[in-house]
């Protein structure tokens, strides 16, 4: 599933998780460590999204539950607090319930789904997720066209209606060159359904259709979404997310990307570096065979700090963590971290 970040919900974490993050920061002063992990369970998907390169790949042998647990333990030792699952379509996995159950015992756990199977699988997963994102890129036929399957919109909405009372839920919407006029409709739908919505900006992968928006048209869409956020509509993105994109892409004030705050693991258990946008999920180092902290603190991240090629929230939002802006911290992270972020975390 392209341009989806399953760990976007860092603003919605409990204070208990916040204390865990603080303990990790204190345990690893002046060290780089991944706070967030994203794991593609498989590439296989029941939809064929235009902007996604991953459903076009053949899955090799997938990790079994013992290997999934081994991966989780490696991530936990490295300081990861959030684990998000994506695909492909995660709900196609027959063992998805057990995988999520094992994850929630160790992490704040989230998942991204296209929603087609959500209603049918709800009982299997509802007690093992802290948050879930359902992809919606337009209203009705617009969504179906982008997703490559008639009925996608209807199934996604039915999934949202079934799950929203059991799992904290948000719509995840990718802004492309074919749906910039859908932003208001998607926000209106989120309000109607009683859920939040997170927006991503499509990035052009080498093996997918070129769907990134034209920059000047995109500017107006971002300004519109920023105004909705300021007006108090249920948008997950921080105000700083929108202002950072505007300042970098249309001004001369790039944000400093910190891709090392997020670690991505492919369906075979390989680490993806420096990020899955530039790497496109081509890993070759097993996570359980790697000293992640040693790798993270010897890898040269400097060339990627000024990248600014994508605006994926799983990279941009964490990169804002040490901004000296208490209101942003209270909105996007945790009250328990305010005192730390007011200072310099030396990240």
Predicted feature residues:
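Conserved alpha-helical substructure of the radical SAM core
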Residues: 2-124, 128, 323, 331-332, ...
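Accessory C-terminal segments flanking Radical SAM cores
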Residues: 38, 195, 220, 233-338
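Generic structural signal for small/hydrophobic residues in well-ordered secondary structure
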Residues: 41, 45-46, 103, 134, ...
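Short glycine-enriched, charge-decorated loop/helix-capping segments at active-site entrances
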Residues: 55-62, 145-151, 212-214
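Radical SAM/AdoMet-radical enzyme domain recognition
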Residues: 65-86, 92-204
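Short acidic, glycine/proline-rich loop/turn micro-motifs
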Residues: 143-146, 208-211, 246-247
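A structural motif corresponding to the C-terminal lobe/cap of the Radical SAM core domain
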Residues: 158-161, 188-192, 209-235, 282-285
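Short, catalytically relevant binding-site loops at active-site mouths
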Residues: 203-207, 241-244
């Amino acid at each position: 599933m392209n341009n989806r970040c399953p760990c976007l919900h860092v603003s919605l974490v409990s204070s208990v998780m916040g204390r865990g993050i603080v303990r990790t920061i204190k345990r690893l002063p002046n060290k780089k460590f991944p706070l967030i992990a994203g794991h593609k369970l498989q590439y296989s998907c029941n939809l064929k999204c235009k902007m996604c390169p991953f459903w076009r790949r053949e899955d090799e042998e997938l990790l079994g539950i013992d290997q999934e647990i081994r991966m989780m333990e490696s991530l936990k030792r490295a300081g990861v607090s959030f684990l998000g699952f994506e695909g492909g379509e995660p709900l196609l996995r027959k063992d998805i319930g057990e995988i999520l159950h094992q994850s929630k015992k160790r992490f704040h756990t989230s998942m991204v789904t296209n929603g087609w199977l959500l209603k049918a699988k709800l009982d299997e997963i509802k007690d093992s997720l802290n948050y879930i994102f359902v992809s919606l890129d337009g209203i009705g036929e617009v969504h179906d066209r982008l997703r490559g399957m008639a009925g996608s919109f209807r199934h996604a909405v039915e999934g949202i209606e079934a799950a929203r009372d059991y799992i904290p839920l948000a719509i995840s919407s990718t802004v492309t060159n074919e749906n910039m006029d859908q932003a208001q409709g998607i926000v209106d739908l989120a309000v109607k359904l009683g859920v939040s919505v997170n927006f991503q900006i499509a990035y052009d992968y080498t093996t997918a259709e070129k769907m990134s928006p034209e920059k000047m048209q995109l500017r107006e869409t971002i300004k519109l979404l920023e105004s909705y956020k300021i007006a108090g509509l249920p948008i997950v993105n921080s105000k700083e997310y929108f202002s950072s994109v505007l300042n970098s892409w249309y001004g001369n004030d790039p944000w400093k990307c910190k891709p090392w705050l997020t670690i991505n693991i492919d369906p075979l258990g390989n680490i993806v570096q420096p990020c899955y946008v530039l790497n496109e999920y081509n890993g070759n180092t097993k996570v359980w065979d790697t000293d992640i902290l040693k790798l993270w603190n010897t890898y040269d991240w400097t060339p990627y700090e000024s990248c600014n090629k994508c605006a994926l929230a799983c990279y941009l939002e964490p990169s804002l963590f040490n901004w000296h802006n208490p209101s942003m911290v209270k909105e996007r992270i945790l009250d328990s971290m305010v005192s730390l972020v007011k200072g310099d975390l030396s990240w």
